[in-house]
């Protein structure tokens, strides 16, 4: 079970909607993933949208929408966007993103911390997209974030987890859920995140931009479960030298042979 603030989810996989080629494909992928929580950029919300919107789809599938502040460059913009989301969708949950520049899409952690502190004071349940810096993650927890979401690598790159040591360090020190966010390229990346101690994984491009989104969504679902089970099972320690899995007792020797 994944518990964030006052909500509990069976699935540890959080999906994003960005990059989906069609509503039909998005629906199939979401169902295949088994997700119960899905992020949507607030700029995709429009009261005059014709046909079924992303929010209508999530409501029909009984998936909790998690509005995010994607595209915001300052704390002020993020706070305004979060308040608009609360008014439009009736939720105080928000994934806070404050991007430093359009080339790297890396978080501006100074603006991010300011935005999160302001939103927590306003009664929001804040999930913060951040760098893989353990000090920043601790600071976000200190200001009241309900979850920290360190990146594995830059958004959309599919490079996987570039600094597994930092991710594991964040997980070992956190008192709130740690959700790997950004950089996942394939199922093994998601499994590794869970093996490192993450409580969940958020991904979008890895599914929505691959050759077979439905198959990849299903793979991610199993990968997250496998990684979580492996973490709980406890891996064997890494060793410099080989250790035989079977003993040498009972092996025939030259002296045992009858000539």
From Swiss-Prot:
Q: Write out the GO MF terms.
A: thiazole synthase activity
What does this gene product do?
A: Catalyzes the rearrangement of 1-deoxy-D-xylulose 5-phosphate (DXP) to produce the thiazole phosphate moiety of thiamine. Sulfur is provided by the thiocarboxylate moiety of the carrier protein ThiS. In vitro, sulfur can be provided by H(2)S.
Reactions it catalyzes: [ThiS sulfur-carrier protein]-C-terminal-Gly-aminoethanethioate + 2-iminoacetate + 1-deoxy-D-xylulose 5-phosphate = [ThiS sulfur-carrier protein]-C-terminal Gly-Gly + 2-[(2R,5Z)-2-carboxy-4-methylthiazol-5(2H)-ylidene]ethyl phosphate + 2 H2O + H(+)
Cell compartments where the protein resides = Cytoplasm
Which HAMAP family does the protein's record reference?
ThiG
Its EC number is: 2.8.1.10
Q: Which residues bind 1-deoxy-D-xylulose 5-phosphate?
A: 156, 182-183, 204-205
Q: Which parts of the chain are coiled coil? A: none
**Keywords associated with the record:** Cytoplasm, Schiff base, Thiamine biosynthesis, Transferase
Q: Where is the active site?
A: 95
> Could you tell me the gene encoding this protein?
thiG
Q: Give the record's GO CC terms.
A: cytoplasm
Q: Name one GO biological process term.
A: thiamine diphosphate biosynthetic process
UniProt lists the family membership as follows: Belongs to the ThiG family.
Main localization of the protein described in the UniProt heading:
cytoplasm
**Pfam families associated with the record:** ThiG
Query: Is Cytoplasm among this UniProt entry's keywords?
Result: yes
Q: Which pathway is it part of?
A: Cofactor biosynthesis; thiamine diphosphate biosynthesis
The protein here is known as Thiazole synthase
Subunit info here reads:
Homotetramer. Forms heterodimers with either ThiH or ThiS.
